[in-house]
Regions:
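PLP-dependent amino-acid enzyme catalytic core
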Residues: 1-495
Length: 495
């Protein structure tokens, strides 16, 4: 069983096993836990993978990662995929054109890729907790929150569930469907707080609470341990490796790729956790060419991956039609820095970002990053045009996936004949007003009206009952607080 290592060095905290890192994701010096070693997937192993089901592949990769989870626990966790649209496989790989395949990661209960990790994650945390009381914090730009709440609701984990969840979301920073998915969750172990601020504020608050001695002491006085469900938690990231491997193996199995060809993977990126899974897959030996980060107008990742400079000093967060990517401080870049440059350099960069609002890689370091990554970005006007263009071709996109189509169009010209997979991170129905406007509806439709408009244009589309039901449920969580009052609001709830 491997130990997890720490991105900013060991400090006074020993490296821990995977289970301990899942339950307590707070590493030394404000850093993150990550894998100390990665297995090598030989061509022979990858060929064996081609004949596995998705669940079998997950179990095999976790076994090779040597994470120390029992076969019974993993089987129990992976049963959550049985409730996805197709119980045989939780994802779908759709052909978009001759060179592009769309990996649909949104067929779970909250219609976003976060279900791929967070549905099994809930059962794993519940089991590893061994009946101890835990508080799970989650900050969301719109998709992580609903997926976490769905996973940890008592109806999923049972009435004797010892885990409570507090979800922080930016009051005006999500789609209406995303908000309704959170504020209608009626389970006594769940608390949803809107904050007056943006996702970066929510994520900073979460990280601060993980390190807050007064807050941790208050929880300990009540016998409560503290954890988090964001991709600061390595347990999330582990599951996000699997579908990148699966996509490659399926394309080889179906004869689309020869085993000597590499595959380029495009990922709409905000907090960098999804594309990080692809990075680890490439490090493990999967023949991935470039990992292409697709951003919206908040294009700090584009700037970083093309110049080596991460600079937030003069940036204002812009509200876009792809709100799950409205992020400026991208947490998981830190794990890439560690993997490529080690703990000392990572610690220097993160300290510089905190103290000066920026850090810069030298030319050699930038070259190392660009061995793995490329980048593109897309503004809202381009996004609308691409939604309309794709719809005319017979494929309905959400705005985040549309940013990925822009990346494909940018790079397919340069990489003629190479194959691409685009990770589609959310179903269109979560962002229906923006999709409807792109397809000719008037601006300002409410979500339900916009959904009806889109369905009227495409009779083949069916609305997921998971989305339909949020419009009928009563709102349970009304509280909105200033950032400075989040800690007190949580403590009051737990009293």
């Amino acid at each position: 069983m491997i130990k997890m290592t720490q991105t900013r060095g060991k400090g006074d905290k020993d490296n821990v096993c995977f289970a301990d890192a899942v339950l307590n994701p707070s590493a030394s010096f404000g850093g993150l836990y990550t894998f100390s070693t990665l297995p090598h997937l030989t061509p022979h192993i990858l060929r064996e993978f081609e004949n596995l089901t998705y669940k079998e592949l997950c179990k095999r990769v976790f076994e090779l990662l040597d994470l120390g989870l029992s076969e019974e626990l993993l089987e129990f966790a992976l049963h959550t995929y049985d409730a996805f649209d197709d119980e045989r496989t939780p994802v779908n790989l759709a052909r978009y054109d001759e060179n592009l395949f769309v990996l649909e990661l949104y067929h779970g209960p909250t219609r976003a890729f976060k279900d791929m990790a967070l549905q099994p994650f809930g059962r794993i945390v519940q089991t590893l907790a061994h009946g101890k009381d835990y508080l799970i914090l989650v900050a969301t730009s719109g998709d992580t929150g609903p997926a976490t709440l769905e996973s940890f609701a008592q109806e999923k984990l049972g009435k004797d569930c010892s885990i409570k969840v507090v979800c922080l979301y930016p009051k005006d920073g999500t789609s209406d469907v995303q908000r309704l998915q959170m504020v209608t969750q009626d389970s006594t172990n769940l608390k949803v707080l809107g904050i007056r601020g943006n996702f970066d504020d929510a994520q900073h608050t979460l990280k601060s609470l993980l390190q807050d001695s007064e807050f941790v002491g208050f929880l300990q006085s009540k016998g409560i341990e503290l954890s988090a469900a964001n991709s600061v938690n390595i347990g999330r990231v582990a599951f996000q490796i699997i579908y990148h491997i699966w996509a490659y193996c399926q394309l080889c199995k179906n004869g689309v790729l020869t085993r000597t060809e590499s595959l380029n993977i495009i990922v709409p990126s905000g907090n960098f956790g999804n594309i990080l899974g692809g990075f680890y897959a490439k490090k493990m030996g999967v023949p991935i060419g470039k990992l292409i980060s697709a951003s919206n107008a908040n294009n700090i990742l584009y700037d970083f991956l093309t110049t080596g400079v991460y600079d937030i000093r003069h940036r204002q967060l812009l509200k876009t039609s792809s709100p799950a990517m409205d992020i400026i401080k991208s947490s998981n870049v830190e794990r890439v820095l560690f993997e490529l440059f080690g703990a000392q350099r990572t610690k220097e960069c993160m300290r510089s970002l905190q103290d000066k609002g920026m850090y810069a890689l030298d030319s050699v370091e930038l070259g190392a990053v660009q061995e793995y990554f490329a980048a593109s970005f897309c503004n809202d006007m381009q996004c609308r045009e691409l939604i309309a263009k794709s719809f005319a071709k017979g494929y309905l996109l959400d705005p985040h996936t549309a940013c990925g189509i822009k990346a494909y169009e940018d790079f397919v010209k340069l990489e003629g004949g190479e194959k691409f997979v685009l990770c589609s991170t959310a179903e269109w129905s979560k962002f229906a007003p923006n999709v409807a406007e792109a397809l000719g509806a008037r601006n300002g439709l409410e979500d339900r009206e916009a959904i009806e408009f889109v369905l009227s244009l495409d009779k083949k589309q069916k609305l997921s009952p998971h989305i339909a039901e949020v419009f009928e449920k009563p709102i349970v969580h009304n509280e909105v607080v200033d950032i400075a009052k989040v800690k007190n609001a949580i403590m009051q709830w737990l009293k």
